[in-house]
């Protein structure tokens, strides 16, 4: 992967990119304090290129029973064999809204290649609010709610208490990219990694 940022750190093969300049404060987070605006960007180096170099999705995220808008539950681990993008968001978050059209395009482009987006609301907004918002934004991917365990795990990884936050999981159930914050650079990294991971087969 090209080095899009100046600070590059090898972290078990996992790419972690912090874009705090365009993150919203997450009122649901258990971690207090403002979102960092000077957090360093972190990417993997070329030393870790194989699928096996990536760490598995934390159990708290993989095995959490996620409630969707119809009241049904599902788990991220049930989607093993697919490339999954997990996005933490809320309707009031500007950077979250800004990246959604890109997510819609990604879902449409790669749906037939086993790619799924799961958008998890972090603010316990009502089903009616979320459905109305999804219709307005023409969201074409699965929506649900992020529980405390999922939020805590994202914060542990990114050390960022704001949203949006995004994780890309490969077909083996391993994290290949985690991004804290939004913005053009974050979206470009997401698009690049989705294309690469989907086409790995």
Residue map of PLM features:
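Short, internal strand/loop/helix patches
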Residues: 133-171
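Short pre-active-site segment immediately N-terminal to redox-active cysteine/selenocysteine motifs
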Residues: 82-84, 88-92, 162
